[in-house]
């Protein structure tokens, strides 16, 4: 991969954090009144983590960020910016990023949230890269994805309740040697499809909305799956062609874990072998904006992603928003 931009930027450290509580799909099946086999075969999630009393998205994000900084060998006070992707903040004001800045001790960083739902972390990566390119004095940006969707799920909705889990993932982004790091990032939004996934804490502000469950996430699952099946092949083809590669040249495919069964299907149809696909959704569910960084951190800690490897990231989120990025794992990245 030789066509990366002159000012190359890459991931030099990863971290993640999951809640303590494990929720087996047998428990979910009993809550929904469906067979356990139905969840396993239709969704592919065996268990997920739900935040318990006292656990917050902010706390998960702060621990993931601290781990990423530690692995990168970067002191908190050297961080120039924190970009945090979430669509489930505990409060709209202040943003989660500001709380994380305080928690990790990144006193010199400016911090703010972005919301592109499950696709938000990739938007954060594009934003972070822009910051580093715009000012040579900036050295390090923390990009965090954190969500607690369990708190906006309807336990009676079989379209959403089996899918999601809570968690946070983080990376440290910095300049890396030429020919390494992140290549072109492509992100698209079609607001006409905004009704495909709707919900969230904002509706809690009205008593009637709370009583009627308006804060619960609702999804048109079949429509979302159809969009993924349509757009996924083009995302893959465009990414590899731009760098003069083929699917076989991609060492690792890290996808948003919307539905593990769907991830396996579209990856196989695009020509990927099972060994190329990083799968986490089967054991932690769909962790929304945390999905991609958790996938990266998992593969790094497992020793799968190594310096020089080619990694393709693909994401989808409400909006609808979808995107991709191809990168060569930097030599400066630490396991």
Residue ranges of model-derived segments:
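Condensing-enzyme catalytic core mediating Claisen C-C bond formation in acyl metabolism
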Residues: 1-53, 155-226, 230, 234, ...
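Buried hydrophobic positions in well-ordered alpha/beta secondary-structure cores of metabolic enzymes
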Residues: 11-13, 39, 68, 79-82, ...
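Short beta-strand segments
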Residues: 12-15, 85, 115, 141-147, ...
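Acidic-glycine-rich active-site phosphate/pyrophosphate-binding loop
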Residues: 32-41, 91-105, 143-149, 204-209, ...
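Glycine/charged-rich beta-loop-alpha catalytic/anionic-binding loops adjacent to active sites
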Residues: 45-47, 78-83, 102-115, 150-156, ...
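Claisen-condensing/thiolase-fold acyl-transfer catalytic domains that form or cleave C-C bonds
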Residues: 58, 62-65, 69, 88-89, ...
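Phosphate/pyrophosphate-binding loops at sites that engage ATP/ADP/AMP, CoA/4′-phosphopantetheine
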Residues: 64-80, 234-251, 299-304
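Flexible, glycine-rich active-site loops centered on histidine and acidic residues
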Residues: 133-168
């Amino acid at each position: 991969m030789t066509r990366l931009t002159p000012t190359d930027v890459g991931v030099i450290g990863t971290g993640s954090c999951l809640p303590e509580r494990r929720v087996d799909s047998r428990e979910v099946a009993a809550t929904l009144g469906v067979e356990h086999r139905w969840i396993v075969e239709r969704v592919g999630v065996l268990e997920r983590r739900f935040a318990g009393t006292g656990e917050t998205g902010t706390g998960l994000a702060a621990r993931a960020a601290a781990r990423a900084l530690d692995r990168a060998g970067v002191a908190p006070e050297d961080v120039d910016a924190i970009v945090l992707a979430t669509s489930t903040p505990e409060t709209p004001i202040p943003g989660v990023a500001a709380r994380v800045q305080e928690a990790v001790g990144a006193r010199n960083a400016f911090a703010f949230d972005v919301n592109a739902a499950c696709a938000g972390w990739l938007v954060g990566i594009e934003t972070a890269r822009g910051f580093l390119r715009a000012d040579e004095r900036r050295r390090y940006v923390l990009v965090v994805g954190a969500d607690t969707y369990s708190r906006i799920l309807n336990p009676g909705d079989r379209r959403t309740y089996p899918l999601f889990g809570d968690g946070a993932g983080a990376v440290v982004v910095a300049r890396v040697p030429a020919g390494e790091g992140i290549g072109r990032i492509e992100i698209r939004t079609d607001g006409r499809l905004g009704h495909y996934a709707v919900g969230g804490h904002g509706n809690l502000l009205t008593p009637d909305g709370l009583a009627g469950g308006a804060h619960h996430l609702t999804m048109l699952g079949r429509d979302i799956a159809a969009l993924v099946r349509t757009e996924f092949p083009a995302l893959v083809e465009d990414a590899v062609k731009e760098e003069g590669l083929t699917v076989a040249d991609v060492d690792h495919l890290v996808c948003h874990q919307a539905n593990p069964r769907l991830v396996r299907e579209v990856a196989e149809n695009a020509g990927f072998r099972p060994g190329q696909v990083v799968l986490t959704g089967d054991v932690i569910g769909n962790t929304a904006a945390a999905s991609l960084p958790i996938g990266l951190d998992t593969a790094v800690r497992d020793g799968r992603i190594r310096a020089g490897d080619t990694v393709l990231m693909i994401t989808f989120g409400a909006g609808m928003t979808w995107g991709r990025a191809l990168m060569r794992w930097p030599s400066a990245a630490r396991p």
